[in-house]
Design a protein with these regions (language model features):
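The AdoMet/dcAdoMet-binding core of the Class I SAM-like
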Residues: 1-119, 131-138, 216
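Conserved Class I S-adenosyl-L-methionine
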Residues: 109-110, 135-158, 170
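Acidic/polar loop patches that form or flank catalytic/metal-binding clefts of enzymes
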Residues: 124, 149-155, 179-182
């Protein structure tokens, strides 16, 4: 969720908003980029951060970075009052059921659009296309987001700890394209060591299986 938009926008990303993600995983990866100046982490449950700091220190290790500002509040309410502020918004949410359901609505995506700068990008977890229930949730999220942004593309990753292991993520913008605007030379020059991501994989991740394309076409 982090390296894909960074490899596209590069040093244009100065200010980032993460909604959810209280474990600190996204923040840890963001903090590896020295040009990022400010990271707001909006987490509704203070206990999530406290527990992860204690029991998952390898994930939560950057939550005390001076660039990171943790706001314990509802992301739905927070985003409503923000306009033209962030270069990148990452929605590291739970599934679209119960408390997390509001983070998949058209209203929420519209507010994210408003909160981004002109060149800004929204990245969100988009559920799995594999099992029927998850696939329906994926469709609903995609329907809502394509009505909120001029450009929306999905990319996939293999995550064995998630149901089916096949998971989708969204990349949405006013026109920035995740493949055509990729800057592999810049990203590779950073010399970041990653376990999964590389710029060749980046391009391939946006080429989706036929059954996923058909699923998404029904709501586009």
């Amino acid at each position: 969720m982090v390296h894909v938009p960074l490899a596209v926008l590069g040093e244009k990303i100065k200010k980032v908003l993460v909604i959810g993600g209280g474990d600190g995983g996204c923040v840890r990866e963001l903090c590896r980029y020295q040009h990022i100046e400010h990271i707001d982490l909006v987490e509704i449950d203070e206990r999530v951060v406290a527990v992860c700091k204690e029991y998952l220190p390898g994930v939560a290790c950057s939550l005390d970075d001076p660039r990171v500002h943790i706001l314990y509040q509802d992301g739905l309410k927070y985003i409503r009052r923000i306009e033209d502020e962030y270069d990148l918004i990452i929605i590291d949410s739970t599934d679209p059921f119960g408390p997390g359901e509001g983070l998949f609505t058209m209203e929420f995506y519209g507010n994210c659009y408003k909160a981004l700068k002109e060149h800004g990008v929204l990245v969100n977890q988009h559920e799995s296309p594999f099992y029927k229930g998850d696939a329906l949730a994926c469709q609903r999220a995609h329907r809502n987001i394509v009505h909120s942004f001029e450009l929306s593309r999905l990319f996939q990753a293999h995550i064995p700890t998630y149901p089916s292991g096949h998971w989708l993520f969204g990349f949405s913008s006013r026109g920035v394209h995740p493949v055509r605007d990729l800057n592999p030379d810049w990203w590779n020059s950073l010399g970041l060591e990653t376990k999964y991501y590389n710029t060749n994989l980046h391009k391939g991740a946006f080429y989706l299986p036929n059954y996923v394309q058909k699923l998404l076409e029904k709501v586009e």
